[in-house]
Swiss-Prot record:
This is Mu-agatoxin-Ao1b. One of its GO terms (cellular component) is extracellular region. SUPFAM superfamilies: omega toxin-like. The modification Asparagine amide is found at N69. The lineage of its organism: Eukaryota, Metazoa, Ecdysozoa, Arthropoda, Chelicerata. Expressed by the venom gland. Negative results: does not affect mammalian sodium channels (Nav). InterPro entries: Beta/delta-agatoxin_fam, Spidertoxin. Residues 1-20 form the signal peptide. The keyword Transmembrane does not apply. The presence of a 'disulfide through disulfide knot' structurally defines this protein as a knottin. It comes from Agelena orientalis (Funnel-web spider). The keyword Disulfide bond applies. GO terms for molecular function: ion channel inhibitor activity; sodium channel regulator activity; toxin activity. Pfam families: Toxin_7 (PF05980).
């Protein structure tokens, strides 16, 4: 009986760890990160510049975030 309870507990723990690591991997895969400020490197296809900035790719792949007002 103790072996069955231990196995159930172990299974639950493995499931929790696997679920947590898959969610973290999903965040990394989706490219979640902080936004990029002025003159920071960006990706034109991902819109990762902060609000008020746009990604300028005059010399790809060296794209940088530029101010919308300037």
């Amino acid at each position: 009986m103790k072996a069955i309870i231990f196995f159930c507990f172990l299974s639950v723990m493995v499931f929790i760890v696997a679920e947590a690591s898959s969610l973290e991997a999903l965040k990394i895969f989706e490219g979640e990160r902080e936004c990029v400020g002025e003159n920071g490197h960006c990706r034109s296809w991902y819109n990762d510049c902060c609000d008020g900035y746009y990604c300028s790719c005059m010399q790809p792949p060296n794209c940088i975030c530029r101010n919308n007002n300037g």
